[in-house]
């Protein structure tokens, strides 16, 4: 079998009922069009629940490669195709970002705000993939650095949000929020979220933050259950640096990047968040306005709208 000139990495939420059927459809259509498929080892038949049967596919002339889910799993691919919900998309976005390629989501979840299409439209999605008929948007990401006792103790990045949270079963977390080197407010809270416009419809929204349109360049700061008169969300410049200092005599805390990558934050630490130089490349098929997506995904009532 001649090696394919094109390869797509498929990342799948194997806990979804329709995952196997949809994945097999992807496998067949890409194979019929001479595009090799790469899958993660945890999702392959011999080591995972997806039952993709790589050996059977190879025997039928379909090129499929099984790789470990390391940070460079998407290197050499042209696209990361996601079958799952927003959690699966965020997991796949990390692989796409590391390889500097686009990520395209097909929703198998409940809301799937980050997905471009639903599972029933998989054939149409694959037509676009085969023809490379999609546009690519650069979505802003955040860089986070943790400093403790004057030295960098940890660092990370996020597409949706950086979430500082108090530890389990601990009391109120005492923090001071600083923007561009100037203190804004000190308060007790359950945590503080720093979000991109992309993440404004996720955890930050649940914590009371506003929805930011994705073409707006800004950073959103949302105190979570703040014990303060001034505990309101703030929208800052995309060039701003947001710092959150934890009381030295207070509790340890945790930072989660996109709800996945976790950092332990000792009391007295300082968390600095700013715009990251490296964006996530987002493959777009849907030309509808963001307003329509918002209404559709959140099932917002629009009865009575008269228009022009």
Curated annotation (Swiss-Prot):
**Domain of life where this protein originates:** Bacteria
Q: List, alphabetically, the PANTHER family matched.
A: NAD KINASE
For activity, the cofactor(s) needed are:
a divalent metal cation
Q: Which reaction does it catalyse?
A: NAD(+) + ATP = ADP + NADP(+) + H(+)
Please give the Gene Ontology molecular function terms for this protein. Answer: ATP binding; metal ion binding; NAD binding; NAD+ kinase activity
Keyword flag Lipoprotein: no
Active site: which residues? 86
Q: What is this protein called?
A: NAD kinase
Family statement: Belongs to the NAD kinase family.
Q: Which organism is it from?
A: Mycolicibacterium paratuberculosis (strain ATCC BAA-968 / K-10)
- Signal peptide (residue range): none
The record lists NAD(+) as bound by 86-87, 91, 160-161, 190, 201-206
Q: Where in the cell is it found?
A: Cytoplasm
Is-annotated flag, keyword Cytoplasm? yes
Q: What is its main location?
A: cytoplasm
| Keyword annotations of the record | ATP-binding, Cytoplasm, Kinase, NAD, NADP, Nucleotide-binding, Transferase
